[in-house]
A protein has these predicted regions:
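Conserved glycine-rich cofactor-binding loop
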Residues: 9, 14-17
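Alpha-helical segment proximal to the catalytic Tyr-Lys
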Residues: 125, 169-170, 241
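Short, small/polar-rich loop/turn modules that mediate ligand/substrate recognition or access, typified
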Residues: 172, 177, 243-245
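Short C-terminal tail/terminal secondary-structure segment
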Residues: 145, 233, 244-259
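A short, exposed helix-loop element centered on a Lys and neighboring polar residues
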Residues: 120-121, 165
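Catalytic loop of short-chain dehydrogenase/reductase
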Residues: 136-159, 164-173, 185-186
Length: 259
């Protein structure tokens, strides 16, 4: 299927590795000029070169911390009028409610609510004027199925979901869509961190922890980053112009609810 994306431009946040990188790769394969971002300049440069080699696409790398105004400004200077914005950022680590102080809450909200909101605010006006825009937020399965250990992440990402739901209704008539991808148990560095924590708590090997995690997934395995990226590319496509304000779970069928 031709997704109708050739010649479009995209900003993909936090894309030097993991889910962000997979989304950048998927968009580049569709002929999108991508601007990738991360805080590790060396890793980012290597990722940019790999995507160029694989796709032939134009890839611009901007090392910046998107939790700062200066970082966001530098990223937007490299692509001031994107057709596509993929919001992505690492979540805060799991923990206990009683251990999260005021600073921890502010840091979680800055990374997973305010940074993506400020990115959307910067680009959505131009998208509406040009009558094309695709915004995809990579949030978390915890938005629909909260867990006490993931409270910091859940609170911030749920707030982002609520903000974007209202905004999506306002901009839909201008051919601007806003959707959210809700991953769970995707085989990334963050999942390895979770497996290592599980192993340490349970006194088992990391391999055994991975096996336990796989058993908890309806599909019986961890997801692959490229599986989420394929869904992301579709939501950015011309064909997805009537899909907006939605939360798409990428979780191997594990979510037990109806809605």
């Amino acid at each position: 299927m031709d997704l109708g994306l050739t010649g479009r431009t995209a900003i993909v946040c936090a894309s030097s590795r993991g889910l962000g990188r997979a989304c950048a790769e998927a968009l580049a394969a569709e002929g999108v000029a991508v601007v990738i971002n991360g805080r590790d300049a060396d890793r980012l440069a290597a990722t940019a070169e790999a995507i160029r080699a694989a796709s032939g696409a134009t890839v611009t790398a901007v090392a910046a911390d998107l939790c700062s105004e200066d970082g966001r400004a530098r990223l937007l200077a490299a692509c001031p009028a994107p057709d596509i914005l993929i919001n992505n950022n690492g979540g805060p680590p799991p923990g206990r409610f009683e251990d999260w102080d005021h600073a921890a809450w502010l840091a979680g909200l800055e990374a997973n609510l305010l940074a993506p909101v400020m990115m959307i605010r910067a680009v959505i006006g131009g998208m509406r004027e040009r009558r094309f825009g695709r915004i995809v937020n990579i949030t978390s399965a915890m938005v629909k199925a909260p867990h006490s250990l993931m409270g910091l992440s859940t609170a911030a990402r749920s707030a982002l979901t609520a903000v974007c739901k209202g905004l999506s209704r306002e901009v839909a008539a201008d051919n601007v869509t806003i959707n959210n991808l809700l991953p769970e148990r995707i085989d990334t560095d963050r999942q390895r961190f979770m497996a290592e924590a599980r192993a340490a708590m349970g006194g088992i090997t990391v391999e055994a922890a991975y096996a336990e995690i796989a058993q908890s997934i309806a599909a019986g395995r961890l997801g692959r980053p490229e599986e989420l990226a394929a869904a992301c590319a579709y939501l950015c496509s011309a064909q997805a112009s009537f899909v907006s304000g939605q939360n798409l779970s990428i979780d191997g069928g594990s979510y037990p609810g109806v809605f």
